[in-house]
Every structure is written in structure tokens, then in C-alpha cells.
Regions:
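Alpha-helical recognition/docking segments in bacterial nutrient-uptake
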Residues: 1-94, 158-159, 163
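Short beta-strand elements in bilobed, periplasmic/extracellular small-molecule ligand-binding domains
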Residues: 12-23, 124-148
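Periplasmic-binding protein-like
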Residues: 42-48, 105-107, 140, 161-171, ...
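Helix N-cap/beta->alpha junction signal
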Residues: 49, 85, 116, 143, ...
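Hydrophobic alpha-helical segments within soluble ligand-binding/sensing domains
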Residues: 81-106, 121, 125, 147-155, ...
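An alpha-beta-alpha
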Residues: 92-132, 231-248
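Flexible loop/turn connectors
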Residues: 155-248
Length: 248
């Protein structure tokens, strides 16, 4: 993904190596992060996601280890780099409204993720501002970002309401499933997705959240946090990267 390319570019410029910590579940991720932090294997951490009450973030914060979140935090004391996802969700919805669409479906990721919550809030706000009804049956949330989830949700939503005239999806994998269902059933419903976008997807537009810049700024910021920690400085960095809608 572009965000990794951005991180890798700046890491290379400053002669840093990158380690990636993954796990099939929260326990495995906690073990991997604990080994990195307590074993002093890395100088700092970048979390590539953000969710409520994350025990990994809590642990790293308590250890006063240099880190930042690529996303949102409710705490004012956690450094982060993010987009304005409420505005991005609003702009995506408004894009379709201005095209004359009135029954806009929303397919998002897990409700635990701040990015899903915020893009959905933007969707709700746009419908409200334009005096359009919010039908809960026209929304769906996937616990996993999988193509088949997008396919299944699209089938379910259209079976419920055949008047849906636009679909917003917050992830490119979900969008691929949406497009596959529409193509297989010869349906022409404009679809919009967020980064990163696969060229083969037949989208009306996508929200460019500037993932390359998100990655670059994230690494530059964690370097600053690492230096601040060495100098006993405490500064909470918060940066918002702009987005834009691009028509296909």
C-alpha cells in the first residue's frame, strides 16, 4: 500500500530499517509489540490503525515509549497523523447528492475503528443537511475488509431496496466485491471508494486520502518524537492530511 511506500521512503532517507509487527489476534499482536518495546528492538512505533480502548496503545503509552497513531484518538495526549474522515465521508456523500442521487447506501468496515465511525458520521451529516432520509437498512458494516463481504452486503442491500442509486464504500477490498456483484448482475449503480484504489475497479469516483503523504509525514513525525524523548521534551504532535475526490 502507498502508506508503506511513504514510510519506507523517509526511513531510507534517514537510514532507518523497518520492522513490521503482526498477529492473528490481539494476544499475538500484544506479544509482538511487547517484545519490540521491552526488548528495545526498535526506536519507535507507528500504529497503522486506531480503535477504541486499544490495549496495545495503552501499554506503549504507559511505558512512555515513542509512538504515534496513523488515525484518530479520543485522548488529547496521543500523537497522531490522520485525515479529517468526518469531512471526507461528508464530501463523498455530497458528491452523489449533487449528482442527483437520493438513496445512497453506505458499506463500511468494523464499527470499532474510528475511521469507519467518522466516515459514517460524515455520511449521516450530509444526508441530514440535504434533508434526505437515513435508512439504517441501507447501511452495512464488515468486521473484515474482504471482497466477499462487499459482494454479500451489496446483494443484501439491493434485495432490501432496489431504489438504491449510489453506493459509498470505505475500503477498496469491499469496493471490489461491490463492483463484482454489480457487474455480474449488469447493474449500473455509481460506486465510490476510499484509497487505495485498484485500477480495474469500475468506480464513479474515489476519495484520495493521500496515503503516500500520510506515510511520509508519519515517519517524519515519529523521528521527531524519538528525538524529543531523548531530550526529555513532551510535545503531542497532531497533523491532518488533506483529501480530495477524484472522478474516474
Amino acid at each position: 500500500p502507498s502508506v508503506f511506500r511513504g514510510i519506507a521512503q523517509v526511513a531510507s532517507e534517514f537510514h532507518y530499517a523497518i520492522q513490521i509487527a503482526t498477529g492473528k489476534n490481539e494476544k499475538e499482536r500484544m506479544e509482538a509489540i511487547s517484545q519490540m518495546v521491552l526488548g528495545k528492538r526498535v526506536d519507535g512505533l507507528i500504529f497503522l490503525y486506531s480503535q477504541e480502548n486499544d490495549p496495545l496503545v495503552k501499554m506503549v503509552s504507559e511505558e512512555q515509549f515513542p509512538f504515534l497513531i496513523l488515525g484518530k484518538s479520543l485522548s488529547p495526549f496521543i500523537p497522531l497523523v490522520d485525515n479529517d474522515n468526518i469531512q471526507a465521508g461528508y464530501d463523498a456523500t455530497e458528491y452523489f447528492i449533487k449528482k442527483g442521487c437520493r438513496n445512497i447506501a453506505f458499506i463500511g468496515g468494523s464499527k470499532r475503528l474510528f475511521v469507519t465511525q467518522d466516515r459514517y458520521k460524515g455520511y449521516q451529516k450530509a444526508l441530514e443537511d440535504y434533508h434526505l432520509e437515513l435508512d439504517p437498512q441501507n447501511t452495512a458494516f464488515a468486521n473484515e475488509f474482504l471482497e466477499e463481504k462487499g459482494y454479500q452486503f451489496t446483494k443484501h442491500l439491493l434485495n432490501h431496496d432496489s431504489k438504491i442509486d449510489a453506493i459509498i464504500t470505505t475500503d477498496s477490498m469491499l469496493a471490489e466485491g461491490v463492483c463484482n456483484y454489480l457487474n455480474q448482475n449488469q447493474l449500473s449503480i455509481p460506486t465510490l471508494a476510499f484509497d487505495s484504489i485498484k485500477p480495474k475497479l469500475d468506480l464513479a469516483a474515489y476519495v484520495d486520502i493521500n496515503t503516500l503523504e500520510l506515510g511520509r509525514i508519519s515517519f517524519k513525525t515519529i523521528l521527531q518524537i524519538i528525538n524529543d524523548t531523548k531530550e526529555n521534551r513532551q510535545i503531542c504532535y497532531r497533523q491532518v492530511i488533506p483529501h480530495r475526490i477524484i472522478e474516474q
